[in-house]
Amino acid sequence: GFDRIVFEFAGEEVPGYHVEYIDKPVRACGSGDVVPLAGDGWLQVRFEPARAHTDEGKPTLGSRELAPRLPNLLVLKSTCDFEGQVEWVAGVGSPNGYRVLELEKPSRFVVDIKHK
């Protein structure tokens, strides 16, 4: 099985993206502050150009941290919304394989992380 993360975007297209496992310490963009994350693997999802705030600077997302309690996905944290770049890092119990999908109507980007 898979644990699924879905990012939804305004507009007709998913922005450019890059997905990879990264080493600790996980750092916030801009400040460089260390971001504590649970898990034995950290899958970074970066979108560019993108933003997660309005023109007035208000966040467009409900939460910057989620703890979904899924078999492998332990936590999902926003680590960047700065200068046209948005990043999220998933803390996983085991850094297993993953796949990505782009979906339409509405525009969505999906990351499926294998359980084993």
Give the residues covered by each predicted segment.
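Short linear recognition/processing motifs and adjacent strand/loop elements at protein termini
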Residues: G1-K116
